């Protein structure tokens, strides 16, 4: 008797939610590699990117997005919201990521955007490992599901990679029978040059004060292979001279630490030795300037 095998499935899934619920951590966990930067700060993700998760049964092309939020005053906020909404075009399904024990107005906004898109939505309740009272999860799920339709509901811990197998199984059911869109060794549609800039920005988000990271962006001026060595030149842009001094730090100590930690992350991701140079420059008001945002690669 011949063995019956399940058909191969392949499709795209948007990962949507308010800021700081763990969308990028979930994307990285499903891909099995770091394709999206993460920090404890809201709005760490500014760009839409694809994370490619390949399994024996199929392939999920995950569209990681900036967090949907109500703030629209600054150009940067508008750009990020456009990127998040635009990620729903042509996808087969979507994941709504929320935080266990919390549902607020921005979660409602995200659900409304998904409802308007008309795609199947899987609710992922992340950070369940942080719940002190695990029995509180079930009434919370009942409350969130009341009056809302989900294709499936999955409590998970993306950070600890708990509950992901069942999630993958349900997502594969929602995408069509098709051949893989990407090769098995591909993990993202973004270039190493782009990822290098993101890894520097990740360190800015982690090492600087409360507001300053949001006034910074990173531009890769040089990315070249020199034998087995990658030579990378990164410009950190800020909006004021005072911010420049803070990023550099006394005697250049903070900039050195930012560059050193970013370099180690690059070497781990790229599998090569990296020579990284960093500079800090000022462009006043760049984060509220549509032309500047476009020049820096924001969609």
Swiss-Prot record:
Protein's cellular compartments: Cytoplasm; Cell inner membrane
GO MF annotations in UniProt: GTP binding; GTPase activity; ribosomal small subunit binding; small ribosomal subunit rRNA binding
Binding-site positions, GTP: 17-24, 64-68, 126-129
CDD domains per the UniProt record, alphabetical: Era, KH-II_Era
Gene Ontology process terms (BP): ribosomal small subunit assembly
Domain KH type-2 residues, every copy: 200-284
Era-type G domain boundaries: 9-177
Keywords: Cell inner membrane, Cell membrane, Cytoplasm, GTP-binding, Membrane, Nucleotide-binding, Ribosome biogenesis, RNA-binding, rRNA-binding
Function: An essential GTPase that binds both GDP and GTP, with rapid nucleotide exchange. Plays a role in 16S rRNA processing and 30S ribosomal subunit biogenesis and possibly also in cell cycle regulation and energy metabolism.
Name recorded for this polypeptide: GTPase Era
Annotated source species: Xanthomonas axonopodis pv. citri (strain 306)
Upper taxonomic lineage: Bacteria, Pseudomonadati, Pseudomonadota, Gammaproteobacteria, Lysobacterales
Gene name linked to the record: era
